[in-house]
Amino acid sequence: MSCFSHVMNPITGENSWQEREDDYDYHQEVANAGFGDMLHDWERNQKYFAALRKTIKGMRAAGREVHVLDIGTGTGILSMMALKAGADSVTACEAFLPMANCAAKIFTDNGVGDKVQLIRKRSTDIKIGADLDMPQRANLLVAELLDTELIGEGAISIYNHAHAELLTDDALCIPARARCYAQVAQSPLASQWNSLKILPNLDGEALLRPPEQLKSCKGEAALHDVQLSQLPAGTFRLLTEPIEIFQLDFQRKEKREKQREKLVQLQASQPGAAELVFYWWDIQLDDQGEILLSCAPYWAHPELKELSASKEERVPVANVVPWRDHWMQAIYYVPKPPQLATVGQDFYLSCHHDEYSLWFDAMLEAPAKTVRRHTCSCDLHMTYSRSRIGQLNQAIRNKRYLRYLEATIVPKQSNVLVLGNGCMLGLASAALGAASVQLHEPHRFSRRLIDSIVQHNELKNVKYVENVEQLEDTELIALSHVFAEPYFLNAILPWDNFYFGTLLMKLKDKLPEKVEISPCEARIFALPVEFLDLHKIRAPVGSCEGFDLRLFDEMVERSAEQAVSLVEAQPLWEYPSRALAEPQQLLSVDFANFNVDHHLQGSIELTQSGVCNGIALWVDWHLDKTNNPKSIVSTGPSEAVVPGEFVKWDMFVRQGVHFPRKPTDLSGRVAWSTDFKPLLGQLKFGFSQEKR
């Protein structure tokens, strides 16, 4: 049975009723739960298994029975490991019912259905006693309750409850403890994700300056989770060695503190601005701390030397450390970065955590009082994503737009309509002397931010438009330019910004014949690639450490077919991929004739050997009709694609990715089709791999 759901279409900008199966939400939750990524993490699996074997063997040698509690069992893999390692009893709990039901089937399929007690509820709801959830307390807890911040999934409270209510006084835990690390760094590139810089003209002179409220804003304390190993080597400078800032003892019977702070005195290893804190953690899986799993970036990884010695020739050194997407590293932005003038200069790092998150500050003098968690006071950080803030600062991108604007804006004559959210470049046309600039800014916070920039730069003749259909005919006929980047807050995939075309069509009949429309055209390109790792987030698991997980694969595949888009958004700079062909154009859209339907098909010859496990897609925006590379703004590769080489991707936008259901390493071609119906806001792609 199906039902209708209210869905926002980013291309039309309208809510529409969409027919979906009753269990669509269930399928979406299953497909996006992320269990598959963890199961492809070979280091995690092997080291958890090794810790279970070692710990259970030690408990047996001490004459103890082993009663295991597995909190958040997922597929049940850790419970099955515990049984195989010799546990007397295993109780597994899982509150996510689709996953719990799948685990029950997996237990049966692996011949342990009658050996694992499965409780379909949260661990904090479990009761101990006869005829209750568990007959007795467990003396070995195995769990994976961690995220990139370590504590973001509620690990502190869950462990506190488990020790108080579910575990014996002498219980052991896997992992036994965790250690958090920080490393202070400077990076002009990464800082672009956090604050708005001066926008210069083509001569390098300031065109738009950020107002005082932006310069004084401390930003958001929230983490920026990234694959730190993929930051280009020349784009950051490490100002300190990694330091341990917090330890979390999972085995301790006493409660783990929900709030802690630590002031660390550091010495600069080189001069620079203490702009960033790089953060990661490691876990000691066994009580003796001999089995270590580290989430460190490659340069700080404790096993880098051993891993580098056995790496494949074509794998970059940044990718020799075990890959995982469920536990990454994080960047925290220092509110007011202190300048470290000399090697060896003392400064202080103030480290804090509450029950779910961390925050940091750095200063030259020890603070007299506790450093409070900082929040955005300028609208920038609460309105825009990190990638969008970086986009606003991207020099090459901005120069291409300004090149167009400086060439076409006639001071005191041009009348400009700017479509999009937070379009600083459109605002620049006012600074270039346009007679009037009308900004389409329906979003309240975005409009307030833009207005603060208008006021600070004393720009005249700027007007805000909430709805383009409210524009008077006399205003429209006077327009010389309709300009966009385009960028809209609702956009997820690059072509969601085709909403620019939808807005244009609402005005088309009232615009003057010679009005300049920029961008005038958009082209979508596709590139078959071989990912080193990203494909694993959608790849079937099959078996893991000798356990059959095909039932899990089938469940996820069924749900993905129902609820996962054929193309999803990913920041590809974080996930190395090798080009298997030249990029090919799949669609060209003329914004002056946006309402035309398109149906196209073709094929891409694979010119390089390798496994085509992904197809990357992006949009090139053509600012004018010259086809001059300097008039094209791409959301794809930042350098020319060379088949067989790793692709360098734009770091300030997410690209689209299609993951083939069954990738092959057969040489041949990728057949594709594109179906675009702009009035319905439908853009569909089809891909299939064919032998040559």
From Swiss-Prot:
InterPro entries: Arg_MeTrfase, MeTrfase_PRMT7, PRMT_dom, SAM-dependent_MTases_sf
Paired cysteines (S-S): none
UniProt-listed Enzyme Commission number(s): 2.1.1.-
Organism field: Drosophila pseudoobscura pseudoobscura (Fruit fly)
Name of protein: Protein arginine N-methyltransferase 7
GO BP term, example: peptidyl-arginine methylation
Domain SAM-dependent MTase PRMT-type: 14-359, 368-692
Pfam families linked: PrmA, PRMT_C
UniProt entry keywords in alphabetical sequence: Methyltransferase, Repeat, S-adenosyl-L-methionine, Transferase
Entry function: Essential arginine methyltransferase that can both catalyze the formation of omega-N monomethylarginine (MMA) and symmetrical dimethylarginine (sDMA). Specifically mediates the symmetrical dimethylation of arginine residues in the small nuclear ribonucleoproteins SmD1 and SmD3.
Coiled coil region boundaries: none
Family note: Belongs to the class I-like SAM-binding methyltransferase superfamily. Protein arginine N-methyltransferase family. PRMT7 subfamily.
An MF annotation (GO) of this entry: histone methyltransferase activity
